[in-house]
Regions:
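P-loop/Walker A NTP-binding region and its immediately flanking N-terminal helices
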Residues: 1-151, 161-166, 173-181
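AAA+ P-loop NTPase domains with strong preference for DNA replication initiators
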Residues: 10-12, 194, 204-320
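Conserved AAA+ ATPase "SRH/arginine-finger" region at the nucleotide-binding site
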Residues: 19, 184-196
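Amphipathic alpha-helical protein-protein interaction segments
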Residues: 23, 76-82, 130, 134-137, ...
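Ser/Thr-Pro-rich, acidic low-complexity intrinsically disordered regions of eukaryotic RNA-binding
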Residues: 82-86, 197, 301-302
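Short, surface-exposed helix-loop/turn micro-motifs enriched in polar/charged residues
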Residues: 133, 167, 175, 208-212, ...
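P-loop NTPase nucleotide-binding module
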Residues: 155-156
Length: 321
């Protein structure tokens, strides 16, 4: 209801900060809001790469998803150069009437979109569009450096008349107060097990897959209330089914887990079984292997703690946490 009221009054739309756990549906709600404000044209998306140049003449390339009315990106992918990316993108959007005129793609088309696509989106959006601004969707804002967040705060003030920012993060405490105070915070809570199971049932019904209620609940629990992960688990169950009827899943169907989760479980078992210099070196090698395969350190440590806790005495659990 809150998002619906914001979409019904596009002229009064403030900067927004969506926060909540992974897989709770933050991005889905953002896209729903954009569609309500700008119409179907906001869902015609294209993926492109944009090149930025830092004051030290270093070139930074960022993947961007765009429509004629908004642009979505994760500035944190630029590392320590994230503040230059934020400043350049918002400044360029504010100076262009249409996002289709921003930058230049590698194929020489002169923008993110072909002109025919831009015209079609404008014609369809005229009936719906009431806003005279563009929207910048910044993902993983809590991973930005302090310098980038300070630059974001200054840019928000300077171009507030022509741009609206929608920020998405998992942990709002890592976003500086000046940025949070300039945004309307919208908390997106993780769905309950029953809600995840209901979504899985809906998806399976649309895909003509028979999903037992027991398996839906098991997937919801195994996903830890992460809806994105639950959908991937459902897909894995369907793909790995070897029966003659792959469209029919059984209640006792095994739920596949990712290789890195199995690897961390092996690491936890090794740590709990033996504490010695040899075991320490083996654990370090496994940690390096996970990091080399681009598993975030925060995810590794959190998963490792959850695997270790059931294997430890109650007197030690507090120290581990």
């Amino acid at each position: 209801q809150r998002l619906t009221s914001l979409g019904d009054d596009p002229g009064g739309l403030p900067h927004l900060l969506f926060y909540g756990p992974p897989g709770a549906g933050k991005k889905t709600r953002v896209m729903t809001l954009l569609r309500q404000v700008f119409g179907p044209g906001a869902e015609r998306l294209r993926l492109d790469k944009k090149t930025f140049q830092t004051p030290t003449k270093r070139t930074v390339e960022i993947n961007m998803i765009s429509s004629n009315y908004h642009i979505e990106m994760a500035p944190g992918d630029a590392g320590l150069n994230d503040r230059f990316v934020i400043q350049d993108v918002i400044k360029e959007m504010a100076s262009n009437k249409n996002i289709a005129n921003m930058g230049s793609s590698k194929d020489g088309s002169g923008g993110f979109f072909a002109s025919s696509s831009a015209k079609n989106d404008e014609n369809e959006g005229n009936k719906k569009q009431k806003a005279e601004y563009k929207v910048v969707v910044l993902c993983e804002v809590d991973k930005l450096t302090r310098q980038a967040q300070a630059a974001l705060r200054r840019t928000m003030e300077k171009y507030s008349s022509s741009c609206r920012l929608i920020l998405i993060c998992n942990n709002p405490s890592k976003v500086i107060d000046p940025v949070r105070s300039r945004c309307l915070g919208i908390r997106v809570a993780a769905p309950s097990h029953d809600e995840v199971a209901a979504v899985l049932k809906t998806v399976s019904r649309k895909e003509n897959i028979t999903l037992p209620d027991e398996l839906a609940i098991n997937i919801a629990r195994a996903s830890n209330r992460n809806l994105r992960r639950a959908l991937l688990m459902l897909e894995s169950c369907h793909v790995t089914t070897r029966d003659d009827s792959p469209k029919v899943l059984k209640a006792n169907t095994a739920i596949p887990h990712t290789d890195w989760e199995k690897y961390i479980a092996m690491l936890a078992a090794g740590i709990a079984s033996e504490q010695s210099p040899k075991a320490l070196m083996a654990a370090r090698e496994k940690l390096y292997e996970l990091l080399i395969n681009c598993i975030p350190a925060q995810v590794i440590l959190k998963t490792l703690v959850m695997e270790l806790l059931p294997k430890l005495d109650d007197t030690v659990k507090g120290q581990v946490v």
